[in-house]
Regions:
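Membrane-interfacial, low-structure loops and terminal tails that flank and connect transmembrane helices
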Residues: 2-29, 107, 189-204
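Alpha-helical transmembrane segments and their helix-start/interface "positive-inside/aromatic belt" motifs
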Residues: 23-38, 107-118
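Residue-level signature of transmembrane alpha-helical entry/exit and packing/kink sites
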Residues: 27-35, 168-169, 202, 206-210
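N-terminal-proximal low-complexity accessory segments that begin disordered
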Residues: 33, 37-50
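Membrane-interfacial interhelical loops
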Residues: 46-79, 112-172, 193
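N-terminal helix-rich structural modules
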Residues: 78-97, 107-119, 123
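Hydrophobic cores of alpha-helical transmembrane segments in multi-pass inner/ER membrane proteins
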Residues: 83-95, 170-185
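Cytosolic-side transmembrane helix boundary signature
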Residues: 101-102, 174-210
Length: 213
């Protein structure tokens, strides 16, 4: 009877701790969601700059068709969201595991920050390079760009010698800097916020929490 009572008390405590863990994981999801939205805003900016830079090349029926232009931006948002979701997958799994284990170390948030900065920087570089590339070839960057790697000096001369490329380069660099600063600030803020709500959970209670979902 005492054993059953003790087990019930542990189960009740586990349910209370589960609510705290859910709150912590909700904050982790909010942290990832904000970074996701910020990244989508930058992707939208790149698409807007690309659209305005090549608007003169469109036929009149497309230039005056707002519905078609809006549909194109929505499809672009869908594509950008797919890319951002792929980037988001690993941090989401990591934060789910750390929330389940009630382990919220600074190095975890630091790793996630570096991960986001690296992959979004690569994405922004491609998005920025796509602006002059599309202006020249009227198609987005694809695997054919690797053909230019064999002419490094020539390619560098074309990029640095063309003044119209300066703005996309500047846009890419400033986007990387702004996103990096935002990610680092958000990581620091949510790290302290989540740890302020942390609680001590015994292994038995943790098993009960895992069993109850």
């Amino acid at each position: 009877m005492k054993y059953l009572r003790s087990l019930m008390q542990q189960f009740v405590t586990a349910c209370k701790n589960q609510a705290k863990l859910i709150q912590q994981f909700t904050l982790s999801l909010l942290y990832l969601l904000i970074i996701h939205i910020v990244a989508l805003l930058f992707f939208f900016l790149f698409r807007l700059v690309l659209f305005t830079s090549i608007d003169y090349q469109f036929p009149p029926d497309i230039q005056n068709n707002f519905l078609m232009q809006a549909t194109a931006f929505i499809k672009g948002l869908w594509f950008d969201n797919v890319i951002a979701c792929y980037i988001l997958l690993l941090p989401l799994v990591i934060l789910w595991i750390t929330a389940l284990c009630n382990y919220h170390s600074k190095w975890v948030f630091r790793f996630i920050s570096i991960f986001f900065i690296l992959f979004y920087s690569l994405s922004f570089i491609i998005s920025a390079a796509n602006i002059p590339y599309f202006s020249y070839f009227f198609k987005t960057i694809n695997s054919s760009i690797y053909n230019w790697f064999g002419y490094g000096a020539t390619t560098a001369g074309m990029v640095l010698g063309e003044t119209s490329f300066y703005f996309p380069i500047f846009l890419g660099l400033i986007s990387i800097l702004l996103l990096s600063g935002s990610v680092l600030r958000l990581s620091s803020y949510f790290y302290h916020l989540i740890n302020s709500k942390s609680t001590s959970i015994s292994p038995i209670n943790r098993l009960c929490i895992f069993a109850t979902g």
